[in-house]
């Protein structure tokens, strides 16, 4: 089935009959990706058939997902998506998920009936064949349980053969953007199903970008290790702690341990520690997610960081390490330029004193003067600018500030503040044109705005009479 045709058919299938949500090609791709993580090869292409999808559903249903993070709602969603995909490939036209499940139940019922009839015929002909087959299955299961993750050679001895390339790539892609989050923990639970303790440690240490998350996981694992040692004193029959954490043993010895419970216990410790770290990052703003704002005082940033560290479930050594490094790494650029030369081991009092004046006008001007001195520029700019309005007014006012009145021509004030008002009509000081009482330069009893005759826009009093130079024209 072609991809475009598959997308059209998926958009017609409802997730539930009561809702208007429909399946998309993204749902199918997610289910296939999770199936591939479980070790089952599943490819969605144009040549995929309904029989292949039915085999994949059967293999996924046979997996033991008790200790896997893919269980509950995610497991049901994967199965339902694959069954809808199978029903479309089989030629059915389901309206919703329930209809597709009904088609699948009918198909499996027919398969069981046909298989039962065939097994009945085989038992009647070869009665001892079934018993031999069951014995072989039990023997193979025991061999696989004892040899995983080691490989059994031809002479029957187990041999450790590490192959972490696929797991390392998956883990690197899962932690590339957000580090150890909830999605990465689910991926970690899937890819560490058959790994020994040394391989799990190598997997965690393969992400140097998120070293802080890995250190938190290791600290929580050490807490569980100490708790198990204390518990072992009262329960001497428990497995050895060194066997659980793989201490003092080679990878081959870890792989050939008789007790598979040790590997599984260490794996559960790592998953629980990673889940606690991921939940702490997403539930409340933890110390890893606290950053200093561009204009936030350094003391306020340290107070928020210390409050977050106090609420974190971690040893005091881990909290002290985080406080020393995060107080520098998560500060803003201005504070980092001062704290980097001091180093993370500097006492907190010196850090606070160094960043006390960061962001103020004085510190900015000091940085400016220092930069200008390094460039060899001599400037009369003072090191500290005035901070009060009075001081600012005293420096920016006065005749030497360059301001000149275009009315009287004097410096020290502007035209709107000039006290020597001048009338534009008569040219005399002391009043404005709207209050002028003169008429053509002569005194008038009526105000300027109430005269009967309109006035010109220029001074007529200053104009003289003009005599024409040409002789007059005489008409006969």
Swiss-Prot record:
Q: Where is the composition biased (Polar residues)?
A: 450-468
Which residue positions does UniProt flag as site: Cleavage? 126-127, 148-149, 367-368, 392-393
Region spans: Disordered: 130-159, 437-476
* Variant or mutagenesis effect after changing residue 71 to K: In strain: Isolate R29-Nadin
Chain location of the short sequence motif PTAP/PSAP motif per the record:
468-471
Keywords linked to the UniProt accession: Capsid protein, Cytoplasmic inwards viral transport, Host-virus interaction, Metal-binding, Microtubular inwards viral transport, Repeat, Viral budding, Viral budding via the host ESCRT complexes, Viral matrix protein, Viral nucleoprotein, Viral release from host cell, Virion, Virion maturation, Virus entry into host cell, Zinc, Zinc-finger
Gene Ontology cellular-component terms for this entry are: host cell; viral nucleocapsid
Tell me, what is an example of a GO biological process annotation in this record? viral budding via host ESCRT complex
**Outcome when changing residue 17 to L:** In strain: Isolate R29-106 and Isolate R29-Nadin
Give one Pfam family. Answer: Gag_p24_C
Q: Where is the composition biased (Low complexity)?
A: 130-147
Mapped zinc finger ranges (CCHC-type) = 403-420, 421-438
* Alphabetized SMART domains for the sequence: ZnF_C2HC (SM00343)
Q: Which GO terms describe its molecular function?
A: nucleic acid binding; structural constituent of virion; zinc ion binding
Cite the effect that the entry attributes to residue 416 to K: In strain: Isolate R29-Nadin
Q: What's the record's remark on domains? A: Late-budding domains (L domains) are short sequence motifs essential for viral particle budding. They recruit proteins of the host ESCRT machinery (Endosomal Sorting Complex Required for Transport) or ESCRT-associated proteins. Gag polyprotein contains one L domain: a PTAP/PSAP motif, which interacts with the UEV domain of TSG101.
UniProt similarity note: Belongs to the bovine lentivirus group gag polyprotein family.
Further facts: The sequence shown is that of isolate R29-127.
What is its biological role?
A: Matrix protein p16 forms the outer shell of the core of the virus, lining the inner surface of the viral membrane. Capsid protein p26 forms the conical core of the virus that encapsulates the genomic RNA-nucleocapsid complex. Interaction between incoming particle-associated Gag proteins and host dynein allows intracellular microtubule-dependent virus transport toward the perinuclear region, prior to nucleus translocation and integration into host genome.
Quaternary form? Interacts with host light chain cytoplasmic dynein DYNLL1; this interaction is critical for intracellular microtubule-dependent viral genome transport.
Under which name does UniProt file this protein?
Gag polyprotein
């Amino acid at each position: 089935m072609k991809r475009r045709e598959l997308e059209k058919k998926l958009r017609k299938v409802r997730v539930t009959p009561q809702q208007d949500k429909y399946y998309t090609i993204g749902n199918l791709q997610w289910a296939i990706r999770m199936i591939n993580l479980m070790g089952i090869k599943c490819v969605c292409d144009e040549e995929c058939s309904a029989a292949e999808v039915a085999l994949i559903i059967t293999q996924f249903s046979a997996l033991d997902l008790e200790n896997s993070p893919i269980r509950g709602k995610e497991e049901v969603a994967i199965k339902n998506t694959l069954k809808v995909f199978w029903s479309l490939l089989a030629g059915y036209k389901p309206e919703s998920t329930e209809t597709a499940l009904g088609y699948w139940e009918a198909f499996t019922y027919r398969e069981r009936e046909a298989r039962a009839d065939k097994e009945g015929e085989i038992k009647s002909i070869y009665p001892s064949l079934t018993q031999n087959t069951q014995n072989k299955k039990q023997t193979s299961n025991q061999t696989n349980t004892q040899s995983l993750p080691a490989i059994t050679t031809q002479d029957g001895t187990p041999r450790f053969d590490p192959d972490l390339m696929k797991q390392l790539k998956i883990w690197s892609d899962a932690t590339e953007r957000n580090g150890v989050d909830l999605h990465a923990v689910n991926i970690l639970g899937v890819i560490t199903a058959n790994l020994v303790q040394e391989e799990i440690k190598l997997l965690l240490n393969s992400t140097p970008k998120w070293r802080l998350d890995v250190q938190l996981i290791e600290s929580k694992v050490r807490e569980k290790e100490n708790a198990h040692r204390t518990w072992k004193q009262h329960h001497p029959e428990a497995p050895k702690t060194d066997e659980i954490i793989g201490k003092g043993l080679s990878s081959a010895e870890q792989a050939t341990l008789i007790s598979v419970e040790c590997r599984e216990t260490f794996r559960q410790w790592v998953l629980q520690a990673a889940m606690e770290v991921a939940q702490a990052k997403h539930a409340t703003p933890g110390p890893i997610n606290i950053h200093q704002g561009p204009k936030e005082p350094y003391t306020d940033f340290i107070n928020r960081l210390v409050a977050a560290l106090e609420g974190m479930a971690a040893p005091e050594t881990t909290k002290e390490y985080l406080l020393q490094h995060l107080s520098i790494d998560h500060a803003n650029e201005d504070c980092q330029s001062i704290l980097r030369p001091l180093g993370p081991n500097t006492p907190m009092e010196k850090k606070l004193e160094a960043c006390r004046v960061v962001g103020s006008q004085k510190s900015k001007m000091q940085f400016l003067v220092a930069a200008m001195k390094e460039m060899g520029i001599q400037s009369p700019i003072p090191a500290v600018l005035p901070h009060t309005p009075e001081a600012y007014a005293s420096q920016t006012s006065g005749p030497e500030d360059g301001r000149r009145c275009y009315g009287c021509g004097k410096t020290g004030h502007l035209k709107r503040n000039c006290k020597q008002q001048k009338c534009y009509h008569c040219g005399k000081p002391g009043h404005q044109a709207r209050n002028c009482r003169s008429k053509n330069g002569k005194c008038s009893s009526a105000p300027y705005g109430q005269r009967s005759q309109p006035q010109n826009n220029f001074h007529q009093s200053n104009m003289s009479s003009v005599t024409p130079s040409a002789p007059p024209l005489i008409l006969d």
